[in-house]
Amino acid sequence: MQQGLKGSIAGVVAAATLLAGGILTVPHAMALEADGQYYSSKQPYVAPSEATTASYSQAPEGYETVYTESMARHGSRGLSSYKYDALLMKMAEAAEADNGFKSDAIKSEFMKNLKAITAANVENGYGMLTGQGADQHQGIGARAYERSKTLFDNAAKDGGKIAYQSSGEARATESGENFARGFNAASNNKLANSTVTPADPAGTGEAAAFDKTPNTLYFHKSENPDGTEKTGEAKQRADDYQNFVENDAIIAGAEQTIAENEDVKTASHDLLSQIFTDDFLAKLADGTYAWYNTVDGTKGGEANCAPGADPSKDADACGAAKKKIASEYDAAMDLYNLYIIAADM
């Protein structure tokens, strides 16, 4: 675990020049390339080649497909909320006031890039699919039809129906809508109107075909994406899971070990020192500086929302106030997490 995280941070050190040169122009990562770049959890999904799909096993002789199911996570998205960009802007503003940038050119480029990626996420919607994410799921839907063409064609003739489900998270439903678009385009809309009526529709329009099933697909939190609360066994499972994540001694110990690892600290400093002065970083390291994701950067301050965003339409444009930068490690991880989202934008 320590080694994996250290590798992630060290990887950003090598990529810091790209960040300084323009975060929004990072080339899209391509999985399996010998010289490809890798972005951990934000590594974009790469569609299989025709040769790969042609190599998939067929049903054994004498057998035929009678049922198929596709379960997928959401596609490429923007930042989940206003947090990494928000906190790094707080840090940048403090550095500007304290002469903490290595040079005026670095300051100008860094702040320009921060503002640009915030603006891009405001325009796209925090946490929502990007065009790349929509394309991914349309392709998955089309390939699902081609893979089981006979099954679906027979279902269209025999009155069969497709059941669509979503966790209720907006980006998940949006992903499903794009899956359906790809599927229906590939099948010439043979089953476009042959869907199971949902017990709890995920929305209107295309989303109306999706049944919200958060007890299954969003089991890990007691509060559902639509703001309702789980009840009964579903709530107990969610509470047990959250208690495990937040209070398990092994997890806490592992996180502390990573944060206190000297190699990780060195990698964090090496990354940040390409942008900020040692004097400024020393104040972060000794506790002089700390920033919370609030309007004034203090603990308990007012909610901090992305410039130009409409919180009534995009609640995620106002970040969680508990998020903070209180160490070089925190800042390096925020910078890394901001950097890797570019591959999905």
For the regions a protein language model found, what residue spans apply to each?
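Secretory targeting and sorting signals
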Residues: 1-31
